Amino acid sequence: MEQMTFWKNTESVSKEIMELLKTIRGDITKITDVQAIVNAANNSLLGGGGVDGAIHRAAGPELLEECRTLHGCETGKAKITKAYNLPCNYVLHTVGPVVANKPTSKDCELLASCYQSCLSLAYKNKIKTLAFCCISTGEFHFPNKTAARIAVETVKSYLSLHKDISVVFNVFKGKDFEIYNQLLQ
């Protein structure tokens, strides 16, 4: 991993919550210090491009076989599988909205629901460390800054009620790393 930043305290978020957040720039399939990673999947859950394809390739064919048994996933929801050849225990698959021009309020609600669904699924499965990729920003065309703001606000809101999970925002691109740094200063 190239860079790691631990967030500072802000006025609106307690120091305790900020200590549960960090960002990493690098390949999500190589993160070794989390129990689960989040896959920005398509509705079929059968692999695709971007991070979805990378996770499927790194996990091996068993992931695809297990995903077939899940019969897809609705936009804004999440499902869990084993991680197989990945260095974590689980993969949480979530399907973000596809944005045509600029995101609608429904798109924003669905993206927030992706983060909420993953956090709830992690809590239900006693997952204490979770890494999120950037959901919907690649092939699904959600604007990076808006998506990051929704991600950070949703996760901070969840952590204000559930302080028993640590969250990593894993980003691959330098511009996303800068965006997350700006949002959490």
Ranges and model annotations:
Residues 2-125:
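Glycine-/small-residue-enriched capping loops at alpha/beta junctions
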Residues 99-185:
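Phosphate/ribose-phosphate-bearing ligand recognition and processing surfaces
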